[in-house]
């Protein structure tokens, strides 16, 4: 089913006019879907630190290329297909979909290889600077971050940036599956391949870290240590599999020393923050044959130190997007787990905001007063 007669839609979006300044709710034009594109009516969008670094001005959008601001941020979304362009065969209006920063064309060498989810057809940076689908009312191009820009009532994107999911899933909460849930869970179960009886440590218990804990639990790790300076994370960490909570501020000794003394190091060290001191700490907390997993979105200039000698004892460092899981499979699996009650996604949504409250929503992320905050569209 195609919609050749579809036209541009005027709707509201949170437009970032300059990094570091509050977003403004503006009327924008979302273009009709062209060939191999779909237009989606958004139901909800999650708030992720990757977008926050740009919104807060810690990184300039123009550094990624393209025009920079004005821009519409957001990549973690759920919605209903409103219309489709020519050549689209997988989607019809009414389909429930999740949006993804990790597109899959399904045909390139990488998409056909089971070991990676990095599609060669789509460059992440170029996707981030897309200006083809959103306009101001006077015709000025707007950057749609990650080729999506889901802080908008409607989006137009490629058919490879959206993925059909179980219609029984509550889309108001399912948006967080597309990034924080999927990234954390599959970083443990797929990328790291946590094994039964292992010892795992997770630094940073935000939206991704909590789901990493659950992935470790799902794969039957024995010791699952959650590390965070926010004591308020202790309760929910335990609910999602944490067997021991460490607050570095009150521990009384360096975390790496404690982990070495008590466990002989950890089999898996997950960095869910992306800051150098934590990366350094995780790197020297590994047991023999241990694996360090980099999940946090570190700035390009961030480097960490690990003695080269340590690698002689089969220690290794890995990283990936969405836990290196194929996006289509990941979203369908997780939505099915959500629907059947295996995965308590609802518990992870700690704060809900309207689009008009989006700046307030980002403040909860900055203050650490949330597991995952979402914007719900009415």
From Swiss-Prot:
Belongs to the zinc-containing alcohol dehydrogenase family. Monomer. The keyword Zinc applies. Zn(2+) 2 binds at residues 105, 108, 111, 119. This is Geraniol dehydrogenase. Catalyzes the NAD(+)-dependent oxidation of geraniol to geranial, playing an important role in the biosynthesis of neral, an alarm pheromone. Cannot use NADP(+). Also acts as a farnesol dehydrogenase by catalyzing the oxidation of (2E,6E)-farnesol to (2E,6E)-farnesal, with lower activity compared to geraniol dehydrogenase activity. Its EC number is 1.1.1.347, 1.1.1.354. Its cofactor is Zn(2+). Coiled coil: none annotated. One of its GO terms (molecular function) is zinc ion binding. It catalyses: (2E)-geraniol + NAD(+) = (2E)-geranial + NADH + H(+); (2E,6E)-farnesol + NAD(+) = (2E,6E)-farnesal + NADH + H(+). Zn(2+) 1 binds at residues 48, 75, 179. Optimum pH is 9.0. Optimum temperature is 25 degrees Celsius. Keywords: Metal-binding, NAD, Oxidoreductase, Zinc. One of its GO terms (cellular component) is cytosol. One of its GO terms (biological process) is formaldehyde catabolic process. PROSITE patterns: ADH_ZINC. It comes from Carpoglyphus lactis. Binds 2 Zn(2+) ions per subunit.
